[in-house]
């Protein structure tokens, strides 16, 4: 039961941030939901930093991992929204736009995760 509370508290914060990002960035472009991309890229950057941290400090309580990764980042990033936005572009015969959004999410998120790991490694070396 305690694990569920940690996940839930993280999810409240992650979903709230995702909603705010959507409100802020989605109106910028009419062709696709820019907020979803920002949320996914930011989430992948943060998960990269957290992966580096948890790899270096495996003794950190599993509750933090549940709170930050499963709860917060699980609700901040949104594969289902991304998927529906790409499919909607395809169904509206906007194949190039859909493919571009697909590639931005895929390669951007992978790159941000790697960047997050590198940022953590550099920061941990500078601080030690």
Swiss-Prot record:
Name the record gives this protein: Fluoride-specific ion channel FluC
Family: Belongs to the fluoride channel Fluc/FEX (TC 1.A.43) family.
Binding site for Na(+): 74, 77
Organism of this sequence: Haemophilus influenzae (strain 86-028NP)
Presence of the UniProt keyword Transmembrane in the record: yes
Highest taxon above the source species: Bacteria
Gene: fluC
Entry's Gene Ontology BP terms: cellular detoxification of fluoride
Classification of source organism: Bacteria, Pseudomonadati, Pseudomonadota, Gammaproteobacteria, Pasteurellales
UniProt main location, coarse: membrane
Cellular localisation: Cell inner membrane
């Amino acid at each position: 039961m305690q694990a569920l509370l940690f996940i839930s508290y993280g999810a409240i914060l992650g979903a709230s941030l995702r909603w705010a990002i959507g409100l802020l960035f989605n109106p910028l472009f009419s062709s696709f939901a820019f907020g979803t991309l920002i949320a996914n890229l930011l989430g992948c950057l943060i998960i990269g930093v957290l992966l580096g941290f948890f790899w270096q400090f495996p003794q950190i309580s599993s509750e933090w991992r549940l709170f930050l990764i499963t709860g917060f980042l699980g609700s901040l990033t949104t594969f289902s929204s991304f998927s529906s936005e790409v499919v909607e572009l395809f169904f509206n015969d906007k194949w190039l736009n859909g493919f571009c959004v697909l590639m931005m999410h895929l390669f951007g998120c992978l790159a941000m995760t790697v960047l997050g790991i590198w940022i953590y490694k550099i920061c941990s070396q500078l601080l030690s």
